Regions:
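Protein-protein interaction/assembly regions in multi-subunit complexes
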Residues: 1-304
Length: 304
């Protein structure tokens, strides 16, 4: 339950939960051998979508910001191996449990395949017949869902703010009984009952929001929500720092993703001015017709 905030803030947290919580997922796959009926890219795609534990992921650096390597290392990645060969007559099933971590991790949790089924098998990766084998090296890296959906920590995120159905959504859309077909939400226990005969206040602003977060297993829902608050705080701190002229706020705090090689560049590089700074071949922030953003035919006040 999120209380005493407005709708915009609640929706901001929802968007952050969906796309900006750091997790870890298989990003690079080196195929050494694959004689199964599945194509290399098919298996690689399945490996990328296997949930890996994000517990302690803050200790892992973003690969693009790692100063110890150019591709991957123990500081910015977790290496897993998949080695399987069918030698019997029966079909061999390859599961997420068959992924073996071979690198030195930052902690004992991050990068571990998430297995929640009672049999302890995990996601099915492929099937092999006699004589077929798969040998692959998987490099898992840190990222967010804005870059690729494989880093998404959640499958669905939603919230409601009218558990008693004061808006009466089904007044004109029901078959037999509106109350039966639109039952009161279980979240209504958090609020006092309302007068069903009272008119709906369309100017009222909701203050209580009831979140429903379904994760893919990489982290717990409460941890995911707390992480969204942290991410939103850091994003706001970056904006405030930039407005105050703090050069360290330009995404250089090791958390906000930035383009490789940008560094402290004050602006974007264009084909007309490789030196960066947001300039063009016509110079400065103005135009070829003069500074100050004016155009021919207009004066300083936008008058003819």
């Amino acid at each position: 339950v999120l209380r005493n905030v407005d709708l915009a803030f609640a929706n901001s947290l929802r968007r952050v939960v969906l796309s900006e919580i750091p997790t870890i997922a298989v990003d690079i796959v080196e195929v050494e051998s694959n004689t199964s009926v599945l194509a290399d890219e098919f298996i690689c795609h399945r490996l990328g979508l296997i949930p890996l534990s994000a517990k302690g992921v803050d200790a892992v650096e973003y690969s693009r910001e790692c100063e110890e390597c150019e591709s991957y290392c123990d500081n910015c990645s977790v290496v897993l191996r998949l080695d399987a060969k069918c030698t019997g007559d029966d079909i061999m099933h390859i599961y997420a449990r068959d992924l073996v971590i071979v690198s030195q991790r930052k902690n004992e949790f991050v990068g571990t395949p998430v297995i929640t089924d009672p049999e302890g098998k995990g996601c099915l990766i492929a099937k092999l017949r006699k004589g077929q084998e798969i040998r692959m090296k998987c490099i898992a890296k840190k990222g967010i869902a804005k870059e690729h959906a494989k880093w998404a920590p959640t499958a669905a995120v939603g919230f409601e703010y009218d558990p008693h159905n004061n808006l009466k959504h089904l007044d004109y859309w029901y078959e037999n009984d509106a109350k039966t077909e639109w039952p009161i939400s279980e979240n209504a226990t958090w609020e006092d009952p309302t007068d069903p005969s009272a008119p709906f206040d369309f100017n009222a602003k909701p203050k209580n929001f009831y979140f429903n977060i379904e994760t893919v297993g990489t982290m717990e829902p409460d941890v995911c929500f707390q992480g969204s608050i942290k991410v939103l705080q850091q994003k706001l701190a970056t904006i405030i720092g930039a407005l105050q002229g703090d050069p360290a706020a330009n995404g250089a705090d090791g958390y906000v993703p930035q383009s490789p090689g940008r560094g402290e560049d004050p602006g974007y590089t264009t084909p007309f001015m490789p030196g960066g700074g947001g300039q063009s071949q016509w110079g400065g922030a103005g135009t070829s017709y003069g500074g100050g953003g004016t155009t021919p035919g207009f004066g300083q006040n936008g008058q003819w």
